[in-house]
Regions:
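Extracytoplasmic ligand-binding site segments that recognize negatively charged/polar headgroups
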Residues: 78-86, 129-139, 154-167, 203-230
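Bacterial N-terminal signal peptides that target proteins for export
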Residues: 2-14
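Bacterial N-terminal signal peptides
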Residues: 12-23
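A short, structured surface patch at a secondary-structure boundary
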Residues: 58-119, 124, 128-133
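Structured C-terminal subdomain patch of bacterial secreted/periplasmic proteins
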Residues: 105, 159-173, 277-371
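Alpha-helical, coiled-coil/dimerization segments enriched in small aliphatic residues
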Residues: 223-250
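Short helix-initiation/N-cap motifs at beta->coil->alpha
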Residues: 36, 101-113, 248-257
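Bacterial Sec-exported substrate-binding components of ABC uptake systems
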Residues: 2, 23-63, 179-213, 342-371
Length: 371
């Protein structure tokens, strides 16, 4: 019987050669993207076991894995069920497996367990750079990467206009859904360009003062608002002046009732998604949304504001702040801030275009006017 005999040196050389060839094979099939933090993220195959750092990040997957945005998700946080129950109920009816989808946390970064994530054996973790889930500053991300699990950071929250493109492109590449990602981004940028072109013609003194109150009725005190990032940056992008940014140093903060009354804003917008605040989102009717906004504007603290007195208050679905669908918020806010410049902009028609890309469309009242 013929036996192949190799010296220890030749055996080591052969093993090194095999390892090198295996590395070349992996590299040949590897996918690499740059995330919103400028990090290079590489996977050696299209991920099939995804963990979402926040449940509401699934909105991006809905545009990519259109038939079933949960087909690759093996774990997520419980934030959508807790913080946007209307949307959760709509998707749970379409995808009953959501009730059994493993939870990695509830609705905070502190509640997320790295051990629970590792037990799910994911091949990709998708985290946001701010919010209710693990961020780049979280030890969870470090632990996963040390365990060999790629972590992709996306962002629709901090710099929504700038980072929606980067986030969707990266997801489209890693998931093998480049065509779907580009289809949505083409729509997004076409609609955004109309806003940008008109805002660019405005003079510096043509920026109405806007007070955006986040989750009034749900938040423990009146005056919770945004600084220069997030929806605050959207106010500036549509040609408004965010009065919150003048005094809130960070992303979010509370302003006093006295400050708001003295600032005398021209536009009042309240965000909401659940009781006892402004009811907006999936399955919510116009009548319900308008009645809930009326309760919020009747609060004695801000009832004296000019836009509220004039019946020109507005309500906006809160979850636009962390969603690729933020183009709808951009268009709605543009019409509220500069109605004379954006008469022909129709966010309802834009939502119809987006719904053509979704198996479960956006069906409900996502913005509302006081009258």
């Amino acid at each position: 019987m013929y036996r192949l005999c190799l010296s220890p040196q030749r055996l080591l050389l052969a093993l090194l050669l095999l390892a090198a060839l295996a590395g070349v094979a992996r590299t040949a099939h590897a996918l690499e993207v740059t995330d919103v933090l400028g990090r290079k993220v590489e996977v050696d195959h299209s991920p099939q076991r995804i963990v979402l750092g926040e449940g509401r990040l699934f909105f991006a997957l809905a545009l990519l894995d259109r038939d079933n945005p949960f087909q690759r998700v093996v774990g997520w946080q419980n934030d959508m069920r807790l913080l946007d129950p209307h949307t959760y109920e709509v998707y749970a009816k379409q995808y009953p497996q959501l009730a059994k989808l493993p939870l990695i946390g509830q609705a905070s970064e502190q509640s997320v367990s790295a051990e629970q994530i590792l037990a799910l054996k994911p091949d990709l973790a998708i985290f946001s750079i701010a919010g209710e889930g693990p961020t780049q500053h979280s030890p969870v991300a470090d632990l996963l990467e040390k365990a060999g699990i790629p972590v992709l950071f996306i962002d629709f929250r901090v710099h929504p206009i700038r980072n929606t493109r980067v986030s969707m492109q990266a997801l489209g590449t890693l998931l093998g859904r480049e065509q779907q990602a580009q289809a949505y981004l083409s729509l997004y940028e076409r609609h955004l360009a109309r806003i940008n072109e008109r805002v660019a013609t405005l003079a510096a003194d043509q920026r109405p003062k806007v007070f955006l109150e986040l989750l009034p009725g749900v938040w423990q005190a009146p005056g919770h608002t945004t600084g220069k990032s997030g929806l605050g940056s959207v106010i500036e992008a549509v040609g408004g002046h965010n009065i919150g940014a003048d005094v809130v140093p960070g992303a979010l903060g509370d302003v006093s009732v006295e400050y708001v009354l003295q600032a005398d804003p021209d536009v009042y917008i309240a965000t909401g998604n659940r009781a006892p605040g402004v009811l907006l989102g999936a399955g919510v009717s116009l009548e319900t949304a308008r009645q809930s906004l009326a309760k919020i504007t009747a609060r004695p603290e801000f009832a004296p504001l000019r836009p509220i007195q004039a019946g020109q208050a507005h309500g906006l679905w809160h979850d636009f702040y962390n969603s690729p669908f933020n183009i709808l918020a951009i268009e709605a806010m543009a019409k509220w801030v500069h109605p004379e410049h954006f008469k022909d902009i129709d966010p309802q028609a834009t939502m119809g275009e987006i719904n053509q890309m979704l198996k479960v469309g956006l069906d409900g009242q996502y913005w509302v006017n006081a009258k």
